[in-house]
């Protein structure tokens, strides 16, 4: 029995109790769908639900009264061994071995679909992440967003959402001008401007521009030549780095297009006509305090140029016009102020602030030999995506950056990530998957198979009764809810942490329970049955690693 099946059984018991008149619901009041979760204390059963406490007020009864009514009905559900009432109204449910073990067969039969859901079906989500300026290689913070953003997209898709991965290409503004001046200075053999960019990559890009445009220094506007060609070259490198990292985008949106085709000006006129802007001190201001911001924001500066927020507002409207139901922005730690202003901008447009969601990420530090790694050979100032991948590889880089909550600062220990040991989390999980594959190969050689020659399953769920098997089945059963929560809370690290727990449960089971007979012993039904459990673990590990964009090796 899967957790979803048990949850449905609890909900059915609740509806049956209402239909039988044991519980009375006021007209127009909807009862919640019951959900079961794994209790922290295994002595409290296999699964627990708080549904009695959730519905008590709606039916005018105490939580324990509701729990008593539900427990009597649940006890009659096939596969349920015992139902205990605890505390204010918790229902602790223990399944019999056959019902619990049936999960192994269910997982294998569902395959890659196990852990997916439809909670977000029909929802189009625009997920913008990385969006690094094309003025240099992707730094470590952008690398974290690449790993987390792509994993979040996969998790949201696993819950049925249509996700548009979008990269906002900032090719408008002062930073691009500084980049162009830096390239031009290096091409002329001069020092970089005081506010310019340094690093070997500037020299490399400058030389590439000269190779493409030999007469660039003698052109009518050398800086414009270096700006246009340099941005194109740098962005091509960024795209290539992301692709090698396993991250590809559906849309690369050019900021400059918002200004070139008049979207910003049209938007500002719309805001003026709706009295959402006012003129003061020579500038145009957005009445953002009326929509929850801590202060009004300048939209058109006193020099007549648009402030950054003008482009941000136009960009949000553009996303909505393209069909996004929800716009998720993944921004760095220095962008906390954007949350309120983007929501205020949405409200000023007459849109819902709930259509804007901002995730703020914190800093990443690399450590080697106990010391912080601060310099990049190529960039000259910060550690880049290429620096990290060169040392640990794509899998370890993506996994290590995704296994932490984005709102926490993290230290990545390069020494740990290059070790083939259990203290290396990505190795620990990948090795568990490789071990399941090895067990399956050995089982095949020993004549242990999931089905007989006629294709009928060789499986008896009641034989999966060892305590280590109960633990392993519990970890398997939790996986769908972990994925659902990862989507709900925008926290793909939940998947990584659960895979580590599952890998641990599998390694302990491997040490305690044999899939193949010992020595010349005969193959028995328990061996065939355990192969189902082994393969269920393999499937869930593969499914979870895929959500993280990490490979699931068959041999290590």
Swiss-Prot record:
Keyword ATP-binding: yes
Coiled coil, from the record: none
Catalytic activity: tRNA(Arg) + L-arginine + ATP = L-arginyl-tRNA(Arg) + AMP + diphosphate
Keywords for the protein's UniProt record, in alphabetical order: Aminoacyl-tRNA synthetase, ATP-binding, Cytoplasm, Ligase, Nucleotide-binding, Protein biosynthesis
Classification via PROSITE patterns: AA_TRNA_LIGASE_I
GO molecular function: arginine-tRNA ligase activity; ATP binding
Assigned EC number: 6.1.1.19
GO biological process, one term: arginyl-tRNA aminoacylation
Subunit comment: Monomer.
Protein name, UniProt field: Arginine--tRNA ligase
């Amino acid at each position: 029995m899967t957790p979803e099946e048990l949850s449905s059984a609890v909900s059915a018991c609740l509806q049956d109790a209402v239909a039988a008149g044991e519980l009375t619901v006021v007209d127009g009041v909807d009862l919640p769908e019951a959900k079961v979760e794994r209790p922290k204390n295994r002595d409290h059963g296999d699964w627990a639900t708080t549904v009695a406490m959730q519905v008590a007020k709606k039916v005018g009864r105490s939580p324990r009264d509701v729990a008593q009514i539900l427990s009597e009905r649940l006890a009659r559900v096939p596969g349920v061994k015992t139902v205990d009432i605890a505390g204010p109204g918790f229902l602790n449910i223990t399944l019999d071995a056959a019902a619990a073990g049936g999960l192994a067969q269910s997982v294998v039969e569902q395959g890659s679909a196990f852990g997916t859901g439809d909670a977000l079906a029909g929802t189009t989500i625009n997920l913008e992440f990385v969006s690094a300026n094309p003025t240099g290689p992707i730094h470590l913070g952008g690398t974290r967003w690449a790993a987390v953003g792509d994993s979040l997209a996969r998790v949201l898709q696993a819950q049925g959402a249509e996700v548009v991965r979008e990269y906002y290409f900032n090719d408008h503004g002062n930073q691009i001008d500084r980049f162009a001046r830096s390239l031009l200075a290096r091409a002329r053999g001069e020092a970089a401007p005081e506010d310019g960019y340094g690093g070997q990559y500037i020299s490399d890009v400058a030389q590439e521009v000269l190779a493409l445009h030999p007469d660039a220094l003698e052109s009518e506007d050398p800086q414009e030549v270096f700006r246009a060609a340099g941005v194109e070259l740098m962005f091509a490198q960024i795209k290539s780095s992301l692709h090698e990292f396993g991250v590809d985008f559906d849309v690369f949106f050019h900021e400059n297009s918002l200004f070139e085709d008049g979207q910003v000006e049209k938007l500002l006129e719309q805001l003026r006509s709706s009295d959402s802007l006012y003129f003061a001190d020579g500038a145009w201001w957005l009445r953002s305090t009326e929509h929850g911001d801590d202060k009004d924001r300048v939209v058109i500066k006193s020099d007549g140029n648009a402030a950054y927020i003008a482009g941000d507002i136009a960009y949000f409207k553009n996303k909505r016009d393209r069909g996004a139901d929800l716009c998720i922005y993944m921004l760095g730690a220095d962008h906390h102020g954007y949350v309120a202003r983007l929501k205020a901008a949405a409200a000023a447009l007459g849109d819902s602030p709930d259509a804007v969601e901002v995730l703020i990420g914190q800093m990443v530090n690399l450590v080697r030999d106990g010391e912080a790694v601060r310099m990049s050979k190529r960039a000259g100032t910060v550690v880049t995506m290429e620096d990290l991948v060169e040392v640990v590889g794509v899998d370890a880089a993506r996994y290590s950056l995704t296994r932490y909550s984005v709102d926490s600062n993290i230290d990545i220990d390069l020494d740990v990530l290059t070790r083939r040991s259990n203290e290396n989390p990505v190795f620990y999980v990948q090795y568990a998957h490789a071990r399941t594959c090895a067990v399956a190969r050995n089982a095949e050689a020993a004549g242990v198979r999931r089905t007989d020659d006629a294709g009928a399953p060789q499986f008896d769920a009641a034989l999966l009764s060892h305590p280590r098997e109960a633990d392993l089945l519990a970890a398997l059963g939790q996986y769908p809810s972990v994925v659902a929560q990862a989507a709900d809370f925008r926290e793909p690290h939940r998947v990584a942490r659960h895979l580590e727990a599952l890998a641990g449960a599998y390694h302990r089971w491997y040490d305690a329970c044999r899939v193949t007979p010992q020595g010349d012993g005969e193959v028995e039904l328990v061996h065939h049955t355990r192969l189902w459990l082994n393969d269920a673990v393999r499937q869930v590990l593969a499914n979870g690693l895929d959500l993280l964009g990490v490979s699931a090796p068959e041999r290590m």
